[in-house]
């Protein structure tokens, strides 16, 4: 009798181990993983801004939305397979762009942190100290090379933009892959657009992350015409208080030949695989 009980207990223990191992394996197999191919995610953070760039496993986060949306942002990043961030960029100090940074820094190991010279926040400073990160202010033309071969170049702000024009002193970044280029404008407005074209007259892009949530202070006709973008992404909240995007901005984009205009307020998070983008563009 005792022998039978011992055998039964051993069988039950073995079954429990197999079940536990199977669950663990299923958990590992079911975990999300980042794509190896170059991809741009324009995350839906309501009336805010956040973009995730992926290349060969390297990850760059540009802005982090609002404080209120930070927990949901962290959950979405984890659901996409983010486990660490190679670079985080704070374009400028407005809360709808850097409000979620503290939560992001708590949730993920971060290799490097870039910000505009004007970006200061006691909470953000404390979060950076906890991570033992020294914030870097990039220079115009500074380039980061990602594992997949893509590059991210900082464009401005130039010295001809006054320090008190916080939106126009946003860090502007150009993400370039073998197939496509993505220009992220932060909250830059028309003076910054003019400055950008003066200092980088050769600038072109396939995908434009529209400046200042589609406000009528950005996306001037001359700027859009020079860029030649085919796709435009506007990050804005549903029924927001600012009227974003402005009808004039949508008109300017259409007249400039932008064939694909997407708004996170309508589409949610927009994921754009960039491989062979030009061949597959609408």
Regions picked out by a protein language model, each given a short descriptive name:
Residues 2-282:
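Non-globular, low-confidence helical/coil segments that flank catalytic cores
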């Amino acid at each position: 009798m005792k022998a039978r009980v011992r055998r039964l207990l051993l069988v039950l223990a073995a079954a429990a181990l197999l079940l536990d191992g199977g669950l663990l394996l299923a958990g590992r197999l079911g975990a999300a993983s980042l794509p190896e191919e170059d991809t741009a995610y324009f995350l839906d953070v309501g009336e805010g801004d956040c973009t995730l760039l992926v290349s060969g496993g390297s990850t760059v986060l540009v802005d982090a939305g609002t404080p209120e949306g930070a927990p949901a942002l962290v959950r979405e990043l984890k659901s996409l397979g983010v486990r660490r961030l190679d670079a985080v960029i704070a374009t400028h100090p407005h809360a709808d762009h850097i409000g979620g940074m503290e939560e992001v820094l708590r949730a993920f190991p971060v290799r490097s942190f870039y910000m505009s010279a004007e970006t200061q926040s006691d909470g953000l400073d404390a979060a950076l100290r906890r991570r033992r990160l020294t914030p870097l202010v990039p220079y115009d033309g500074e380039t980061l090379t990602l594992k997949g071969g893509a590059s991210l170049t900082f464009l401005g702000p130039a010295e001809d933009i006054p320090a008190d024009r916080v939106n126009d002193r946003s860090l502007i970044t150009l993400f370039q892959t073998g197939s496509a280029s993505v220009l992220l404008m932060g909250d830059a407005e028309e003076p910054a657009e003019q400055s950008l074209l003066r200092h980088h007259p050769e600038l072109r892009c396939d995908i434009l992350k529209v400046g200042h949530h589609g406000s009528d202070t950005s996306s001037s006709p001359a700027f859009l015409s020079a860029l030649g973008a085919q796709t435009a992404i506007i990050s804005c909240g549903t029924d927001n208080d600012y009227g974003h995007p402005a009808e004039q901005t949508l008109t300017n984009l259409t007249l400039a030949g932008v064939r694909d205009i997407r708004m996170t307020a309508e589409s949610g998070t927009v994921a754009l695989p960039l491989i062979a983008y030009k061949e597959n563009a609408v």
